[in-house]
Regions:
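PP2C/PPM-type serine/threonine phosphatase catalytic domain
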Residues: 1-140
């Protein structure tokens, strides 16, 4: 399977700062494809939402760097999925705790895509979306 990746965010026309973050990581193994991608959309009505977006994407990066050497030799796809889901829940809790402890309005939506071999898995926190683009575009 050929995989092409690209990542970009933009602050848009109305914001002074970009509260969005995006990461995409791909294993360098030719045999066992592993891709983790995550886009976080900061909540514009919260002044410091870029903090939440950065916490989430940095957490996905740490997770990928830690897991990539274990798949598939030590962990099968099911174990990787379970570990990723736990990580997303923990990152969401981390953002919530940061907000409560500091009394700071931060928050973001998050959509993540995990690809292992020929299968893909989608994770959401909030209302962001992921699309599959072939001859046409379809929300997944």
């Amino acid at each position: 399977m050929k995989v092409y990746v690209g990542c970009i965010t933009d602050r848009g026309n109305y914001r002074e700062k970009n509260q969005d973050r995006v990461v995409c990581h791909m294993s360098d193994s030719k045999k066992n494809l592993l891709v983790a991608a995550c886009v976080c959309d900061g909540i514009g009505s919260f002044e410091y939402s870029e903090i939440a977006s950065e916490m989430m994407t940095a957490g996905v990066t740490r997770w990928f760097q830690g897991i990539k050497g274990y798949y598939p030799a030590v962990m099968d796809a099911e174990a990787v999925l379970e570990d990723f889901e736990v990580t997303i829940r923990e990152l969401n809790e981390l953002v919530y705790t940061y907000r409560m402890d500091r009394g700071t309005d931060i928050g973001c939506t998050m959509s993540a895509l995990l690809i292992m071999e020929r299968n893909y898995y989608v994770f959401h926190v909030g209302d962001s979306r992921i699309y599959l683009v072939r001859e046409q575009m379809r929300q997944i």
